[in-house]
């Protein structure tokens, strides 16, 4: 049997692509080395931020606004346990922060609902937060966080119900291209399709070793927190930059535990077994202490944590491009620790590619040619 589309890697982007391509009427095969959602990639840990006024650059704003529309649509499938929670996101940092300047610029260019607060205004609205006098806050009222594992589970179930073939716990060991399309090799045999999407996350280099992606081990952890830090008390999700440039992110507390992680840093790794569990690196449990001590001093001890992996591109911008010499294979990788919020729209872009539709977005900034 020859498929219209084979998806290699059915985590964040692949799960979305499988759903949108199947919904469009294509004959799709989703594959994954594990059983998604799982703990082996970048999507576990329950929650991910979604920010609209994008500090990583204005080029992302059209993508994230479309992503939000798709997240809202997906959330309607889980109204009792919504995939998107509009908690608001407060971006904290020094007044001269380049990241916050990008947030403000994106908000202005796209007329987004962002409120600027000085240090006193931040602490008056959220007494749990402490910041120096030279800090500002940019509050995104319409942003919030996503239930990452629930989203993937929902997409996979919806795709299956729509008739998508799914081959999980079955690693793809090789990709071949010929005049008839794409063939993948797995331990279960070979499968053919007209087109392929490669969104294998951290370990894309196992299949495509020439791709400029560097896996980095990262951790996040949950700390003791009471109801003051919860959504019910209108405590927001947040990003925060310390005076030394270190960047943190976090979420409102749930079940008396507040999740926080450090965006920069981490350990460069070259194989899956190098991603050791949380607490096996000495700094894991204390990584968030500088932020907590200075900005959220009421938070208690570390309760537990987890390790994940970033698939970093050299410039930490996404890679969305066809493989050189193979226009029937789309590569989506290098999401560099800020990709999950875009999973919905990247899945839609992949489905459009499979249907020979021109993308509605300018994907030029994400081409591989920028590294040449």
From Swiss-Prot:
Its EC number is 1.5.3.-. It catalyses: N(alpha)-methyl-L-tryptophan + O2 + H2O = L-tryptophan + formaldehyde + H2O2. Pfam families: DAO. Binds 1 FAD per subunit. It is an enzyme of class 1 (oxidoreductase). It comes from Shigella sonnei (strain Ss046). Keywords: FAD, Flavoprotein, Oxidoreductase. InterPro entries: FAD-dep_OxRdtase, FAD/NAD-bd_sf, Me_Trp_Oxase_MTOX, MTOX. The modification S-8alpha-FAD cysteine is found at residue 308. It comes from the Bacteria. GO terms for cellular component: cytosol. Belongs to the MSOX/MTOX family. MTOX subfamily. This is N-methyl-L-tryptophan oxidase. FAD binds at residues 4-34. One of its GO terms (molecular function) is N-methyl-L-amino-acid oxidase activity. Catalyzes the oxidative demethylation of N-methyl-L-tryptophan. Its cofactor is FAD. NCBIfam families: PRK11259.1. Transmembrane segments: none annotated. Monomer.
